Amino acid sequence: MNKAILHTIIIYTLASCPYCIKAKALLDEKNVVYEEIEVSNFTQEEKEKFIKKSGGKKTVPQIFIDNIHVGGCDALFDLEKEGRLDKLLEGQPKKKMPAAGA
């Protein structure tokens, strides 16, 4: 079994949300692969599932690492300040770096 498949980061966002942009920038800085899910076109049922999955939170971003709800942008940056984010991201797939000269 491929262990990389077990590791996932999902971030629920809105395109124009500055907190979403900031959270994605931190994840990009960490060079980890994440799945971004845009919530603006969610059906009512999808919205309800999102809110339930997010522990009642209706705001974005909402970030999940290995199916564990981390929280929003502030929570992500708090983990970084506390030195705990890198530990949570251990084993996450890294983004492929472009070849030299590409």
Curated annotation (Swiss-Prot):
InterPro entries: GLR_AS, Glutaredoxin, Glutaredoxin_subgr, GRX_bact, Thioredoxin-like_sf. Residues 1-96 form the Glutaredoxin domain. GO terms for cellular component: cytoplasm. Keywords: Cytoplasm, Disulfide bond, Electron transport, Redox-active center, Transport. GO terms for molecular function: glutathione disulfide oxidoreductase activity. GO terms for biological process: cell redox homeostasis; cellular response to oxidative stress. Disulfide bonds join 17-20. Monomer. Pfam families: Glutaredoxin. It comes from Rickettsia felis (strain ATCC VR-1525 / URRWXCal2). It is found in: Cytoplasm. Belongs to the glutaredoxin family. The lineage of its organism: Bacteria, Pseudomonadati, Pseudomonadota, Alphaproteobacteria, Rickettsiales. Its main location: cytoplasm. This is Glutaredoxin 1. Has a glutathione-disulfide oxidoreductase activity in the presence of NADPH and glutathione reductase. Reduces low molecular weight disulfides and proteins.
